[in-house]
A protein has these predicted regions:
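Active-site-proximal helix/loop segments of hydrolytic enzymes
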Residues: 2-5, 13-15, 23-110
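Extracytoplasmic/periplasm-facing segments of secreted or lipoprotein envelope proteins
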Residues: 18
Length: 110
């Protein structure tokens, strides 16, 4: 059985994150989908609009709830962001994982 790979574009249209972030990450996601190996993964796009969304944290909670309702512990989430920083020289990648699971850490380190 294939694992699900949830792709989330980070913010909703209502709560867009950094200036221009929502448009940028959607373009990245659209370029990413055809590159993913569907031999091992069922690729699932996470919806970005939920009824009753009234804050960025509500949006995140509803996204996580949707993913949990549509997946299981063997699945993976990639949430794409284009964060900003006060320091114009800041560069890099950030990976977050569930610290209560050695398996999550192993996956994040791959």
């Amino acid at each position: 059985m294939k694992r699900k790979l949830f792709i989330d574009t980070g913010h909703s249209a209502k709560y867009q994150g950094a200036n221009g972030e929502v448009e940028w990450v959607r373009k990245i996601a659209e370029k990413l989908y055809p590159l993913l190996d569907t031999t091992y993964w069922d690729v699932v796009k996470v919806p970005d609009v939920y009824p009753g969304e009234n804050s960025a944290s509500t949006s995140l909670i509803k996204r996580i709830r949707w993913i949990n309702d549509n997946g299981d512990a063997n699945d993976m989430l990639v949430s794409i962001h284009a964060n900003s920083a006060a320091n114009v020289n800041a560069r890099g990648v950030e990976t977050c994982y569930y610290s209560g699971s050695d398996k999550s850490k192993e996956e994040a380190l791959r």
